UniProtKB/Swiss-Prot annotation:
This is GTPase Obg. GTP binds at residues 166-173, 191-195, 213-216, 280-283, 309-311. It comes from Synechococcus sp. (strain RCC307). It is an enzyme of class 3 (hydrolase). Monomer.
Length: 331
């Protein structure tokens, strides 16, 4: 399935039905009064979060959504039928913004959560409303009102508590595949991961925590280089970041500094949240490197460094314990 995390759509609520002009015509009522009924209300447009959806792909092929109009009134003061609400389903984690005003209308995070985005027009009034002592046979009636129209920007931000970040080939996909049941594509070339991958990591208690593997970032990602700008938004909701540094890289310290620079450039508080610094691929390092690299990284970045290998399992239990501690959950 193609992963689409941004979409623009236009929505239009239904128009209210017109009121009508009508008079009673019963056989034994020779001077029948006005009996024109009111029009029905136009259909509203509502967005609803659906946990079964993972992408905004559907909106790539359909971008105009229009609710039905209300029905016109009838004789004998009968009100026209109101139109049904048009329900548009979106993935949990979808932010909705009005393109005309740039206002954030809502953030649908919980399954079943709804957001009214366009209200249907009111029905017009039939001539029965205009009966008075002065006018016993009014012919006045009103048309239904137009429904609201909006152009919307939909933006999906994944609902993960832990985000894995690092330069291409830092070992993020391998790590998430070992820790969870996720099976991302893994290969030895940059940008193997082209979309974010989610995996649920189970704690001994049986509860699950969602990890997100964010596609590899490169220098300039915050300004749109590589794949990073498209996917940095997906770590905005995370509570903890795992910063993976490839220990087999020619210059792991420079790699770590590049990624920190991108997080800082993107902003939105990414540098302020808890971040675990992890040196990966320890199985590829000799004893001298295993002793020197963690100390150099720690001295340069000013924080502790954990050493892991997703291949041998070294350090994984300790890493998870730190994650649970940062999240404030029991292991």
């Amino acid at each position: 399935m193609q992963f689409i995390d941004q979409a623009r759509i236009a929505v239009k609520a239904g128009r209210g039905g017109d009121g009508i002009c009508a008079f009673r015509r019963e056989k034994y009522v020779p001077a029948g009064g006005p009996s024109g009924g009111d029009g029905g209300r136009g259909g509203d447009v509502v967005l609803q979060a659906d946990s079964n959806l993972q992408t905004l792909l559907d909106f790539k092929y359909k971008r105009l959504f229009q609710a039905d109009d209300g029905r016109r009134g009838g004789p004998n003061r009968s009100t026209g039928a109101s139109a049904n609400t048009l329900l548009i389903r979106v993935p949990c984690g979808t932010e909705v913004r009005d393109l005309g005003t740039d206002l954030l209308l809502g953030d649908l995070t919980d399954n079943g959560e709804q957001l009214m985005i366009a209200t249907g027009g009111k029905g017009g009034l039939g001539n029965a409303h205009y009966l008075s002592n002065r006018n016993r046979a009014p012919e006045k009636f009103t048309e239904g009102k137009d429904g609201e129209e909006r152009e919307l920007q939909l933006e999906l931000k994944l609902l993960a508590e832990v985000g894995l970040v690092g330069l291409p080939n830092a070992g993020k996909s391998t790590l998430i595949s070992v820790l969870s049941a996720a099976r991302p594509k893994i290969a030895d070339y940059p940008f193997t991961t082209l979309v974010p991958n989610l995996g649920v990591v189970r704690r001994p208690s049986g509860d699950g925590t969602v990890f997100a593997d964010i596609p590899g970032l490169i220098a300039g990602a915050a300004q749109g280089a590589g794949l990073g700008h498209d996917f940095l938004r997906h770590i905005e909701r995370t509570r903890v970041l795992i910063h993976l540094v490839d220990g087999s890289s020619p210059d792991p310290i420079a790699d770590a500094q590049v990624l920190l620079g991108e997080l800082e450039a993107y902003g939105n508080g990414l540098l302020e949240r808890p971040r675990l610094l992890v040196l990966s691929k320890s199985e590829l390092l000799d004893e001298e490197q295993l002793e020197a690299l963690p100390a150099q990284l720690s001295d340069t970045l000013g924080q502790p460094v954990q050493v892991i290998s997703a291949v041998t399992g070294q350090g994984l239990d300790g890493l998870l314990q730190q994650v649970w501690q940062e999240l404030g959950v029991s292991s």
